[in-house]
Amino acid sequence: MAFHFRRLCFFSALLAVVLQLLHGVSGQLVVVEEPISAPPPPLVDLNTGDGIVPALFVFGDSLIDNGNNNNIPSFAKANYFPYGIDFNGGPTGRFCNGLTMVDGIAQLLGLPLIPAYSEATGDQVLRGVNYASAAAGILPDTGGNFVGRIPFDQQIHNFETTLDQVASKSGGAVAIADSVTRSLFFIGMGSNDYLNNYLMPNFPTRNQYNSQQFGDLLVQHYTDQLTRLYNLGGRKFVVAGLGRMGCIPSILAQGNDGKCSEEVNQLVLPFNTNVKTMISNLNQNLPDAKFIYLDIAHMFEDIVANQAAYGLTTMDKGCCGIGKNRGQITCLPFETPCPNRDQYVFWDAFHPTEKVNLIMAKKAFAGDRTVAYPINIQQLASLN
């Protein structure tokens, strides 16, 4: 289908204006208290015992952000109802109706839900920290259309700050090094480098690079960034590839035939291919490093092919959003979402529902080599 880049830019700008008006000149969102019915129990049972790894450190974007943008001047926020409608405690900043994929992974690892860097205090940091930030990318300029965000480089710097905090709590450098070496690092970056950089007409990158060159550029930066995390002590890394971005409601809304944009899907292929090669190279070149790749695109294809088996009925529109495919403007404050959220793949214009997040978490944790390569998260966590 033909993809209209100018429309994407227009709707992004329109969303920014709408959110600015909703937040008011003070920058504070005015909300009206209303009762929220108790959410159903999570699809993954929380194991409150000892985890099989000491901690989980999370880096990424809005797919796994859990509140780091709440208190920065940004249009990329989800700390308002109906976000969190199915989360115990309501909206937190997660871009979802409930749990994210890394929430499910944390539970499967036997860990508590990992706190956002902006809120982590005291002994909480000993079990892990989530540094992910909506609109963030591998490249520092990515997401500038949303103003505030925390790019990957800054997220790594924030991890360094956490290490300093942990040093005062766990017996010094030796104890830190041992704990960090045995901990898991989850990284999910890159989607905004396309959606909020390369595909935006007001960014120069599309005129500077073809799709292969841009994929090469991203992975060059990515390699350096992951090596920084390795040099800070990380050894067990889970790196998520990009999904079928041409099938998200925001992109579907730009076309006229209701089909996924193969132009966008093909655009991100060089990135995924390069990431797989990068992981192989890092495993070979960095002593004791153990990187694994999560094939998010393959997970999505399986969900689409077997939607009935998963209890899903709606693949082409968001549960909460405005306009065509409920994807032209993403979920706004106090908008009424669909009642049958467990039957939807997408919660809003860009992000999966809790149901799909937890399906993918289980696949990442215990799936075969078609979704987790060369081993899955459970196997990675169990390695000495």
UniProtKB/Swiss-Prot annotation:
The active site is at S62, D348, H351. InterPro entries: GDSL, GDSL_esterase/lipase, SGNH_hydro_sf, SGNH_plant_lipase-like. GO terms for molecular function: hydrolase activity, acting on ester bonds. It is an enzyme of class 3 (hydrolase). It is found in: Secreted. This is GDSL esterase/lipase At1g71691. It holds the Pfam family Lipase_GDSL. Its EC number is 3.1.1.-. Belongs to the 'GDSL' lipolytic enzyme family. Residues 1-27 form the signal peptide. GO terms for cellular component: extracellular region. Its main location: secreted. Keywords: Hydrolase, Lipid degradation, Lipid metabolism, Secreted, Signal. One of its GO terms (biological process) is lipid catabolic process.
